[in-house]
């Protein structure tokens, strides 16, 4: 199919001179043409040679290679982003496999921990509780008039690192970089926001460099009222925006999602995005083994909002494959620090209640313990799939993995906790303990493992396979909501792009070099379901594909023409 493109048209720019060079979305640096240098008062402000973006990217790549630590590389890339965003995305696109772990997990974790120390330049919006009476003014100060995607955090549960206060801003910045890199969403349409509601991290409160509000976190009614005020202000400024909740604490994540998912186009990536990519991976892994997800028994370590969100999405997929909901729930076992979730346990959270196992079904289990540990569960359930979302390293022990492998010749093991320092077990250990027979997918990137002369690719079950395509699909279709069915469509589409499924061998997930193709396909599937469900205006398939193409931004310089403000 041939698409028409509008991206070769000139841009009319009201800025000139040093102001233009300081505008990251518009700055071309040494790539301004001689005509543009004359028209925009740039003569003498740049070296003589007019370069192409590829020449600029090659210089930046050479400079990047001169940095020895991942955090220094991260700082360097962020400086380019804050100087020339088009060059930043061209550079990332040229070296995606190398740089994605640097701009996001795992390196972004260290960047969040050291946010106030390595701070260079403002990016995004910092909304402090102290300024709660000035929300409209704060959002009016944002120069982007056509914001289409916002990622917002309150910094309380950053990856597996806990409360990082305003340091959590590193996550929305990094996440939106992936919306652009993987999903083609123009950086001009994106906005990172951190809600500064204080911090309970004493190390930050004692740090003289900490740039956030030095106050214990506000809670309960004060907190929820503040979040509501912010969201109402966002709705007033950008009524059609897609709002992604990111790294909120377990106690707040699900209530906020349930409160706002039908009020504003929104989703929680930790709960729904993680669930969608995990289900897509499991569908592909099951099909690659010649079976269906409905034939598997699944054990979770970690029963927080993310783990339970994944479990509910798995159950929905099992039901789609023809199994009753009651039977589907009997195939999913949730283990937390208090053991297997069972009926009658005290202090269960609302979202955990439907995921408990009935004690009467466990009467014949081989155990003498009142608290059923992960090892007890693995020994008695004999699962095909083991998923870790605990945030605690090393909990998938050799004994547990070997016990699983004893009853399952091709176990699927997914230690998903981020960053790498929090992973439940390393791929190297899992493969060693299973004689190379496990199928391993992780949340953070790991290098291929060589065992007995054979190399094993490690699939990264990363949300970046899902959320950029969802964002692109929402924008292209004009969807007003993100529904469960749209998320399921994303999972199915990801599974269809699995090399293991399509070729009978290879990794369970597509290579990163193919991620834009996957994102476009997910965008189409998501947009189509949105239209079918009535949350987007129905169009032809051709029109939806054209809208996806029109909205897919590429890091290329456009010609500038000068205009007055």
UniProtKB/Swiss-Prot annotation:
It is an enzyme of class 1 (oxidoreductase). Its cofactor is Mg(2+); Mn(2+). The record marks 270 as: Important for activity. NAD(+) binds at residues 157, 270, 418. One of its GO terms (cellular component) is cytosol. Keywords: Metal-binding, NAD, Oxidoreductase. It catalyses: (S)-malate + NAD(+) = pyruvate + CO2 + NADH; oxaloacetate + H(+) = pyruvate + CO2. The keyword Oxidoreductase applies. Its EC number is 1.1.1.38. Belongs to the malic enzymes family. The keyword Metal-binding applies. GO terms for molecular function: malate dehydrogenase (decarboxylating) (NAD+) activity; metal ion binding; NAD binding; oxaloacetate decarboxylase activity. The active site is at residues 104, 175. A divalent metal cation binds at residues 246-247, 270. This is NAD-dependent malic enzyme. InterPro entries: Aminoacid_DH-like_N_sf (IPR046346), Malic_enzyme_CS (IPR015884), Malic_N_dom (IPR012301), Malic_N_dom_sf (IPR037062), Malic_NAD-bd (IPR012302), Malic_OxRdtase (IPR001891), NAD(P)-bd_dom_sf (IPR036291), NAD_malic_enz_proteobac (IPR023667). NCBIfam families: PRK13529.1. Homotetramer. Divalent metal cations. Prefers magnesium or manganese. SMART domains: malic, Malic_M. HAMAP family: NAD_malic_enz. One of its GO terms (biological process) is malate metabolic process. PANTHER family: MALIC ENZYME-RELATED, NAD-DEPENDENT MALIC ENZYME, MITOCHONDRIAL.
């Amino acid at each position: 199919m041939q698409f028409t493109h509008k991206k070769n048209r000139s841009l009319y720019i009201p800025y000139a001179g040093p102001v233009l060079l300081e505008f990251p979305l518009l700055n071309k640096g040494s790539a301004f043409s001689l005509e543009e240098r004359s028209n925009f008062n740039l003569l003498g402000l740049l070296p003589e040679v007019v370069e192409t973006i590829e020449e600029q990217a090659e210089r930046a790549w050479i400079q990047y290679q001169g940095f020895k630590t991942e955090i220094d590389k991260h700082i360097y890339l962020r400086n380019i982003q804050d100087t020339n965003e088009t060059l930043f995305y061209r550079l990332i696109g040229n070296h995606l496999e190398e740089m994605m772990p640097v701009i996001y997990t795992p390196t972004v974790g260290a960047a969040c921990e050291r946010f106030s120390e390595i701070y260079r330049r403002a990016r995004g919006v910092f909304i402090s509780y102290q300024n709660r009476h000035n929300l409209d003014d704060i959002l009016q100060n944002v120069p982007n008039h056509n914001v289409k995607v916002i990622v917002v955090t309150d910094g309380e549960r950053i990856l597996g690192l806990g409360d990082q206060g305003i340091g959590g801003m590193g996550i929305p910045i990094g996440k939106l970089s992936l919306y652009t890199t993987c999903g083609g969403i123009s950086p001009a349409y994106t906005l990172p926001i951190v809600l500064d509601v204080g911090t309970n991290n004493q190390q930050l409160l004692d740090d003289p460099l900490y740039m956030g509000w030095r106050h214990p976190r506000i809670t309960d009614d004060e907190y929820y009222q503040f979040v509501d005020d912010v969201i109402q202000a966002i709705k007033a400024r950008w009524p059609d925006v897609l709002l992604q909740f990111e790294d909120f604490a377990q106690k707040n994540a699900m209530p906020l999602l349930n409160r706002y998912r039908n009020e504003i186009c929104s989703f929680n990536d930790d709960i729904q995005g993680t669930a969608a990519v995990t289900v897509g991976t499991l569908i592909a892994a099951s099909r690659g083994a010649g079976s269906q997800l409905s034939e598997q028994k699944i054990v979770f370590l970690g029963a927080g909002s993310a783990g339970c969100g994944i479990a509910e999405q798995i159950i929905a997929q099992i039901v789609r494959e023809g199994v009753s909901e009651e039977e589907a729930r009997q195939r999913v076992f949730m283990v937390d620090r208090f053991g297997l979730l069972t009926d009658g346990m005290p202090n269960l959270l609302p979202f955990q209640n439907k995921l408990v196992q009935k004690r009467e079904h466990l009467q014949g289990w081989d155990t003498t313990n009142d608290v059923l540990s992960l090892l007890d569960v693995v020994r008695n359930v004999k699962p095909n799939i083991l998923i870790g979302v605990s945030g605690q390293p090393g909990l998938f022990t050799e004994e547990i993995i070997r016990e699983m492998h004893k009853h399952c010749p091709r176990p699927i093991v997914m230690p998903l906790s981020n960053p790498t320092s929090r992973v439940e077990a390393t791929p190297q250990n899992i493969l060693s303990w299973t004689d190379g027979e496990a199928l391993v997918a992780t949340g953070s990137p790991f290098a291929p493992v060589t065992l007995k002369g054979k190399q094993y690719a490690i699939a990264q079950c990363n949300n970046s396979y899902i959320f950029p395509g969802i964002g692109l699909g929402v924008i292209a279709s004009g969807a007003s909501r993100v529904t469960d069915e749209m998320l399921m469509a994303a999972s199915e589409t990801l599974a269809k792009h699995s090399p293991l499924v399509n070729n009978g061998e290879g990794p369970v997930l597509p290579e990163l070099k193919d991620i834009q193709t996957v994102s476009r396909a997910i965008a189409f599937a998501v947009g189509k379901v949105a239209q079918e469900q009535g949350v987007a205006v129905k169009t032809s398939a051709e029109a939806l594909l054209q809208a996806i193409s029109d909205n897919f931004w590429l890091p290329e310089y456009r010609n500038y023409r000068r205009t007055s403000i």
